[in-house]
């Protein structure tokens, strides 16, 4: 082999490594490791040095993050429950989602945003519950305050969301900040949008004090809303996500279609169109929709026509136990009977030439 060709072959593996995108949020696997924080820190593959340092230095925060993974993945699956890609996770895969998030798609944008939001939520909650040594209630919410109803005293335990955001930024963004490529910038943007979304739903709660509930005195605190509000908000952002391209100097984005508005810090951004997720595809990581339950009467994404990609569906007759004939008995109980309900369940057919093994 001549010298130029030999040089190309020597460089090819490195070139492929550089060109192949990587799902960089390996910390997602923290929810599956279990055990002590040291076991967690040492057994999650792909953490960069600053993440491992934070992991060893703050084991109580890592426990909160690990528990939070279960919460935000469940929220992701709730939001995508009626779609072809249903945010399904893979056992024994440190990226949790497999190759599907290698594509810089809307789905990737949502997952990075909801995971970042989940870290903020989990850490902030752990702080308020006294489970983290390095933080507690928000120290800035002391003394008196004023709102449209008048003067009040700060009391109770205001959620220290600024600590949650600061720690989430340092931990979650660490690997992305080491990269200068387009995908790293996309992830950083969506991570930040996710963090901001939790703070958006911080609400003031108050308790009245005074004679006969006169509310002459009020004690107030700031509390995070249920995580479902954040999930619903990011779902709306997913549906309105903006496709972008890198600008010429490689430092930011510009819209792919000039007819659309420039993305704000609250918007989700993506580079690539999504696959249709209809069939199992090892290249894209799609598990397909064969075996998925569909809704025969729906006209939405969960309809048998859309979910099954026009392949048709199978119908099975099943029975299930339900509560029926419920009556209120004084005082104070509701008593029900157990009844069998017969219903039809419709599941998507597999492609005739597909290598299908298990439903998603």
Curated annotation (Swiss-Prot):
Q: Does the keyword Secreted feature in the UniProt annotation?
A: yes
Signal sequence segment = 1-25
Q: Which GO terms describe its cellular component?
A: extracellular space
Q: List the disulfide bonds.
A: 76-87, 127-135, 137-157, 206-220, 208-215, 278-309, 294-304, 308-348, 324-339, 326-336, 331-332
- Record key words, sorted: Developmental protein, Disulfide bond, Extracellular matrix, Glycoprotein, Lipoprotein, Secreted, Signal, Wnt signaling pathway
- Regions crossing the membrane: none
Answer yes or no on keyword RNA-binding.
no
What modifications does the entry list under PTM / processing?
Palmitoleoylation is required for efficient binding to frizzled receptors. Depalmitoleoylation leads to Wnt signaling pathway inhibition.
Lipidated sites in chain (O-palmitoleoyl serine): 212
Main function: Ligand for members of the frizzled family of seven transmembrane receptors. Probable developmental protein. May be a signaling molecule which affects the development of discrete regions of tissues. Is likely to signal over only few cell diameters.
Q: What is this protein called?
A: Protein Wnt-2
Protein source organism: Ateles geoffroyi (Black-handed spider monkey)
Organismal lineage: Eukaryota, Metazoa, Chordata, Craniata, Vertebrata
């Amino acid at each position: 082999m001549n010298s130029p060709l030999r040089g190309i072959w020597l460089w090819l593996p490195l070139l492929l490594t550089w060109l192949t995108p990587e799902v960089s949020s390996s910390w997602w696997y923290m929810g599956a490791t279990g055990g002590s924080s040291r076991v967690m820190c040492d057994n999650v593959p792909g953490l960069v040095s600053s993440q491992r340092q934070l992991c060893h230095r703050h084991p109580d925060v890592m426990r909160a993050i690990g528990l939070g993974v279960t919460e935000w993945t469940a929220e992701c699956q709730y939001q995508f429950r009626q779609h072809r890609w249903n945010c399904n996770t893979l056992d024994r895969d440190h990226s949790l989602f497999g190759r599907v998030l290698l594509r810089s798609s809307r789905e990737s944008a949502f997952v990075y945003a909801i995971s970042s939001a989940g870290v903020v939520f989990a850490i902030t909650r752990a702080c308020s519950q006294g489970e983290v040594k390095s933080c507690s209630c928000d120290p800035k919410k002391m003394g008196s305050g004023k709102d449209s109803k008048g003067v009040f005293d700060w009391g109770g335990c205001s959620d220290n969301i600024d600590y949650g955001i600061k720690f989430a930024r340092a931990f979650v963004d660490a690997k992305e900040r080491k990269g200068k490529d387009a995908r790293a910038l996309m992830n950083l943007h969506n991570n930040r949008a996710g963090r901001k979304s939790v703070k958006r739903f911080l609400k003031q709660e108050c308790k009245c004090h005074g004679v006969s509930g006169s509310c002459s005195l009020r004690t107030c605190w700031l509390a995070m809303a249920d995580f479902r509000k954040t999930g619903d908000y990011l779902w709306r952002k997913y549906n309105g996500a903006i496709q972008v391209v890198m600008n010429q100097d490689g430092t930011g984005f510009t819209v792919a279609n000039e007819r659309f508005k420039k993305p704000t810090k609250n918007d989700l951004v993506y580079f690539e169109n999504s696959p249709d997720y209809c069939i199992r595809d090892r290249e894209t990581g799609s598990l397909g929709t064969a075996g998925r339950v569909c809704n025969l009467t729906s006209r939405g994404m969960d309809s048998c026509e859309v979910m099954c990609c026009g392949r048709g569906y199978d119908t099975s007759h099943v029975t299930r136990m339900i509560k029926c004939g419920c009556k209120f008995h004084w005082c104070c109980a509701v008593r029900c009977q157990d009844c069998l309900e017969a219903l039809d369940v419709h599941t998507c057919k597999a492609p005739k030439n597909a290598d299908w093994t298990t439903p998603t």
